[in-house]
A protein has these predicted regions:
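Phosphate/NTP-binding elements of NTP-utilizing enzymes
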Residues: 1-196
Length: 196
């Protein structure tokens, strides 16, 4: 469960305002979450040691779906392991996945889209659906809320609105260059230059 003290923080800029004592209290928790995102997570499921991938962990831990938080399903675990194999195999260009309705695939794929979008530099990620309006609904009803629900430490710098209608831009917001601010040597903020 996400600690209440951290849930108040919305961006890394909020985190930077706190003192080292506060940061020291939470740095292990944050590093553990990054480790689980990258390497996956082992847990006991009915007394059976069970591994889930980092992508599956992000889906279960940080994705809210239409009924609340997703439940663990063995079929999803197998799907995510197979998906990691597809990503690791340089000969693979993706997968064809036949599914039934109400299987959670739209939320799983939206979760993966946000997960990849928040760690990848210089990427353009998209949604393909049977119609443009269906893709837009998936973006506004699934992708954006998943991104919004991420804790501050997984959120890169974002340009634009907090609930965008057409694009999530993980880049430094543009600012107007004038004679007065041309020579300012402010702290450089680095963005991913990635958009969904």
């Amino acid at each position: 469960e996400y600690p209440k003290e951290l849930s108040k923080l919305k961006t890394i800029f909020d985190w930077n305002k706190y003192d080292n004592q506060f940061k020291g209290k939470w740095v292990d928790y944050i590093e553990t979450e990054f480790d689980r995102r990258e390497h996956g997570f082992w847990f006991l499921n009915k007394k059976q040691k069970t591994y889930i991938t980092g992508t599956h962990y992000m889906y279960l831990q940080w994705t809210k779906i239409d009924i609340g938080l997703p439940e663990f399903r063995e079929s999803n675990r197998i799907f995510f392991i197979y998906w990691e194999a597809c990503k690791a195999d340089t000969r693979c260009f993706g997968m064809c996945y036949l599914k039934n309705r109400r299987s959670g695939f739209s939320f799983m794929s939206s979760s993966e889209l946000v997960n990849i979008g928040t760690i990848t530099k210089n990427a353009r990620l998209g949604i393909l659906s049977k119609t443009g309006s269906d893709a837009k609904i998936m973006f506004t009803d699934k992708v954006v809320p998943i991104s919004t629900n991420y804790p501050f430490f997984f959120k890169p710098v974002q340009d634009g609105m907090d609930k965008p209608k057409t694009e999530l831009g993980f880049r430094v917001p543009a600012s107007k260059i004038t004679r007065n601010n041309m020579d300012k040597n402010e702290e450089d903020i680095e963005g991913l230059d990635t958009s969904i």
